Amino acid sequence: MHKEIGSCGDSAVATLQASAGTNETMGIEGYWHVECRDAQGNLKWNEEFPNLVVAVGKQLMLDTLLKGSSYSVTGPYLGLTNASLTPAATDVMSTIVPSKEFTAYTVGGSAVRGTAVFASSTSTGSTPSNVTSSTATAITYTITGAGGTVYGCFLVLGSGASSTQSNTGGTLYS
């Protein structure tokens, strides 16, 4: 006679792999506030609208801020546009200038783009949803000659940027 002995049992293996994290993101956006005044300084209309910070503008900001190299600001200069544009992240200065730049104006008596002077930034708090902002002082553009329609504005800065109207140098920021 044969004798067989068997055993039985349960075996279980459980593995848990978890990766928890929080995403921290930063968006760059801006708003233009435009006021139109007549020759006597009376407000004719004002408008506020969002602007797009283009890819090359974001790259310039990150390259100068995070790389740690020395950098001095050239500009920023605020130009005006003479055509209705559909902003794209791929826009560069040659997208706008010279064909779409409105040039029938002076700033301080000279036919130049206005220099944007930004204040130190401020923040609404320390939570992830806070808003950090920096505002620029107002620039007065005096429309000359036959005038025309101003459709928008653009900000250019960086190496090669110039206050000279119709100049394509520099990096388009927005």
Task: Give, region by region, the residue ranges found by the protein language model.
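Small cysteine-rich, disulfide-bonded extracellular modules of the LU/uPAR three-finger superfamily
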Residues: 1-151, 157-174
